[in-house]
Amino acid sequence: MIEDKKVIVQNKKALFNYFIEEILEAGIVLKGSEVQSLRQGKASIEESHASDNGHEVFLYNCHITEYEKANRFNHSTRRPRKLLLHAKEIKKIIGRIRIKGYTLVALSMYFNKKNKVKVELGIAKGKKLYDKRAAIKEKDWKKDQSRLIRQK
């Protein structure tokens, strides 16, 4: 989306497990020790997803490793983190994820040009097993094609 961003972590499994229909950008509420840990790149959003809690949206299962120099002021690694969105966006998201089969998945986390941590979210629909198999076959075929072209 934005050219001036320093990517902290990406969720590569999300593109394999889901059909991404729409991509959104959201701010995230963090503690100081969490930001320091993110600057070191110590985070994982592989299993993370977002969900609504009334009129707010929270990011769940996002693992941010404890910052070793924060000692007693450290954060819990998997706490729910509030996402910062406009009210219109929240209503739109809640309407979409309440439909059966849709979920809100974290795709990447990055620092923008103002050094604020942003989360890229995708409104996604889960893939069936046969969809995943078809994606693997297509990927393998593209690899084979490129090998054949290089050999000629």
From Swiss-Prot:
UniProt GO molecular function: RNA binding
Any one GO biological process: trans-translation
Keyword Cytoplasm in annotation: yes
A Pfam family: SmpB
GO cellular component: cytosol
Superkingdom, natural source: Bacteria
Compartments where found: Cytoplasm
Keywords, sorted A to Z: Cytoplasm, RNA-binding
Family: Belongs to the SmpB family.
HAMAP family given in the database record: SmpB
Role, per record: Required for rescue of stalled ribosomes mediated by trans-translation. Binds to transfer-messenger RNA (tmRNA), required for stable association of tmRNA with ribosomes. tmRNA and SmpB together mimic tRNA shape, replacing the anticodon stem-loop with SmpB. tmRNA is encoded by the ssrA gene; the 2 termini fold to resemble tRNA(Ala) and it encodes a 'tag peptide', a short internal open reading frame. During trans-translation Ala-aminoacylated tmRNA acts like a tRNA, entering the A-site of stalled ribosomes, displacing the stalled mRNA.
Name of this protein: SsrA-binding protein
Gene name, Swiss-Prot/TrEMBL: smpB
